[in-house]
């Protein structure tokens, strides 16, 4: 499968994802999220994005579940679909969740079927997170990943969204989670040496989900995959419990 990146560092690149890459990520998602044939997925994000195409749709099909796709995002239509189709699983970006929370009739909908609500691309402010949990229940999780890694790399699980936890654990809500299933994650310096916890370096990933390379661009492929490690371009630090805190993109830091 050929999927193009968003082009945040320039011209979009064609990412070559193999059958092996996709299967590895799908199996990780099934095990990590405890999905089953009773899963009813709602696609709101565009299918040209790996979050919707792989992490949601193909994962649901792999286990024999049901997948429902909306033509476009509309906060009212999302709530209506969850209620009508008895959706159990969906994935949204924070701005979508914010728009749903702004609806005056949001609490009038029966959302009790929903057991997994993922969000990604950015952390959520604590006040918005409280409102989201108040509406949907304690079912939110955050996912971090890239097209080059066939979607998710790490997850901040629902149990990490405990708003009654102590200050140290609440700090984890600023992270994007930790290692997801078979993904091996390291924070490396420019020379490829692993950094100790608390030190900022580049998030690097090694797993069966890492892409085959960039379409017709061997030079960019060599830059991205070094000694088996995908260099994500995201700068972060890891705490002692392996939670990862992103601070910016590699080419944006001074």
Where are the regions a protein language model picked out?
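Short beta-strand->loop structural element characteristic of the AMP-binding/adenylate-forming
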Residues: 13-16, 43, 65-72, 141, ...
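Residue-level signal for inorganic ion chemistry
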Residues: 64, 82, 90-93, 192, ...
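Conserved S/T- and glycine-rich ATP-binding loop of Class I adenylate-forming
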Residues: 5-8, 41, 47, 82, ...
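Conserved pre-ATP/AMP-binding loop-to-beta segment of ANL
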Residues: 1-4, 11, 34-40, 181, ...
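Conserved ATP-binding/catalytic segment of the ANL
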Residues: 174-179, 183, 191-198, 202-254
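Conserved AMP-binding A3 loop
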Residues: 1-24
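Gly/Ser/Thr-rich phosphate-binding loop
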Residues: 87-92, 101-171, 184, 194
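Conserved AMP-binding/adenylation subdomain of ANL enzymes
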Residues: 23-40, 48-89, 102-104, 158
């Amino acid at each position: 499968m050929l999927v193009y990146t968003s082009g945040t560092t320039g011209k979009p690149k064609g990412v070559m994802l193999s059958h092996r890459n996709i299967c590895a990520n799908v199996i990780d998602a099934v095990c990590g999220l405890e999905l089953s044939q009773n899963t009813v997925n709602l696609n709101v994000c565009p299918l040209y994005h790996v979050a919707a195409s792989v992490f949601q749709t193909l994962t649901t099909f792999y286990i024999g579940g049901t997948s429902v796709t909306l033509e476009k995002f509309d906060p009212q239509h999302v709530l209506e679909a969850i209620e009508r189709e008895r959706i159990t699983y969906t994935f949204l970006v924070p701005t979508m969740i914010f728009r749903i929370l702004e609806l005056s009739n949001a609490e009038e909908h029966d959302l009790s079927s929903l057991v997994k609500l993922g969000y990604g691309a950015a952390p959520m402010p604590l006040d918005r997170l409280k409102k989201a949990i108040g509406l949907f229940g304690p079912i939110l999780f955050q996912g971090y990943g890239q097209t080059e890694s066939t979607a998710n790399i790490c997850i901040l699980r629902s149990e990490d969204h405990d708003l009654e936890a102590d200050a140290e654990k609440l700090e984890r809500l600023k992270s994007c989670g930790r290692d997801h299933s078979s993904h091996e994650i390291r924070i490396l310096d420019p020379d490829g040496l692993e950094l100790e916890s608390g030190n900022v370096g580049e998030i690097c990933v090694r797993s069966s989900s890492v892409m085959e390379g960039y379409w017709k661009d061997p030079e960019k492929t060599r830059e991205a995959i070094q000694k088996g490690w995908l260099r994500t371009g995201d700068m972060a630090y890891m705490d002692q419990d392996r939670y990862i805190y992103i601070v910016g993109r590699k080419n944006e830091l001074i």
